[in-house]
């Protein structure tokens, strides 16, 4: 899967933002989620993620050995992918980055959000315990939390989201 060139176009993104998709954040939570460059998703703009140039140690699956129990887009616009293994399994950072948020966060429960150098953000929620704090530098594959059932969760798992400037997209495009 390493030899993948991902092209995100504005032609695909309006499907997730045209009102058919339920917002993943409440109005109160939106104060923490801002689009840094609003014109980024204007018609004709493209974002390229050259994953084929990454070395094996530069990325990691968030929950090795995990099973997808709820895919992106299911259940009325699910904004991420739910991955399950055993309770308190180790959650790993997908890429190098800086922890932007590590705290209890409404329906997400214990959440870790990591901002990566390419503008990508990854989100890991429902954690039993966060192992990193806001401002920490993390490496791909580093332990950042333990799977849990905090917030609005019905079983122990990690809810994994990928976002660029606040706009979520299918994590399967990366992994």
Where do the PLM segments sit?
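Small beta-strand-rich domains/subdomains or short beta-sheet motifs embedded
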Residues: 84, 90-94, 124-125, 135-138, ...
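Short, flexible surface segments
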Residues: 64, 87, 95-96, 108, ...
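Polar/charged, compositionally biased leader and regulatory segments
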Residues: 1-8, 12-71
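Short, acidic/hydrophobic/Gly-rich beta-strand patch recurrent on exposed beta strands
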Residues: 81-84, 111-116, 159-161
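Conserved, short, structured surface segments that act as functional micro-motifs
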Residues: 134-175
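Short, glycine/small-residue-enriched coil/turn segments at secondary-structure junctions
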Residues: 53-60, 73-104
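Zn2+-dependent peptidoglycan hydrolase active-site motif and core
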Residues: 78, 94-131
């Amino acid at each position: 899967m390493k030899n993948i060139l991902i092209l995100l176009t504005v032609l695909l993104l309006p499907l997730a933002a045209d009102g058919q998709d339920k917002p993943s954040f409440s109005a109160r939570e939106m104060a923490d989620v801002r689009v840094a460059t609003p014109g980024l998703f204007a018609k004709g703009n493209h974002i390229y993620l050259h994953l084929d140039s990454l070395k094996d140690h530069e990325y990691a699956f968030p929950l090795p050995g995990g099973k997808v129990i709820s895919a992106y887009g299911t259940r009325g616009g699910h904004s991420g992918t739910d991955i399950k293994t055993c309770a308190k399994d180790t959650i790993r950072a997908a890429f190098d980055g800086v922890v932007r948020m590590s705290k209890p966060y409404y329906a997400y429960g214990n959440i870790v959000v990591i901002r990566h150098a390419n503008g990508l953000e990854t989100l890991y929620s429902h954690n039993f315990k966060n192992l990193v704090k806001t401002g920490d530098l993390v490496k791909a594959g580093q332990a950042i939390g333990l799977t849990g059932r905090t917030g609005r969760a019905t079983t122990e798992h990690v809810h994994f989201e990928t976002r660029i400037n606040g706009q979520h997209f299918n994590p399967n495009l990366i992994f």
